[in-house]
Amino acid sequence: MEKKKGVRGKIILECTGCVRNSHNRVSKGVSRYITQKNRHNTPNRLELKKFCPRCYKHIIHGEIKK
């Protein structure tokens, strides 16, 4: 039997600093985190302040489309 797909879905958070400063960064790549959110309680895009190992500081990570 299959599991029911609930309101909780997986989302990807991407570093906003790495995306904006892609032309002059020291390391290549973009920092991403995978997490879950309840789509009924939080219908808007999620933004969390998390540590970016590429920027070496805490910076806002925003939700991206899959």
UniProtKB/Swiss-Prot annotation:
Xref: Gene3D superfamilies: Ribosomal protein L33
InterPro entries according to UniProt: Ribosomal_bL33, Ribosomal_bL33_CS, Ribosomal_bL33_sf, Ribosomal_zn-bd
Superkingdom classification of source: Eukaryota
Keywords: Plastid, Ribonucleoprotein, Ribosomal protein
UniProt subcellular location: Plastid
GO MF annotations, alphabetized: structural constituent of ribosome
The UniProt record lists the keyword Ribonucleoprotein: yes
Transmembrane segments: none
Gene Ontology biological process terms, A to Z: translation
SUPFAM superfamilies: Zn-binding ribosomal proteins
Principal localisation: plastid
GO terms under cellular component: plastid; ribonucleoprotein complex; ribosome
Coiled coil residues, start to end: none
Keyword Protein biosynthesis among UniProt keywords: no
Similarity section: Belongs to the bacterial ribosomal protein bL33 family.
Protein name: Large ribosomal subunit protein bL33c
Organism, as annotated: Cuscuta gronovii
Phylogenetic lineage: Eukaryota, Viridiplantae, Streptophyta, Embryophyta, Tracheophyta
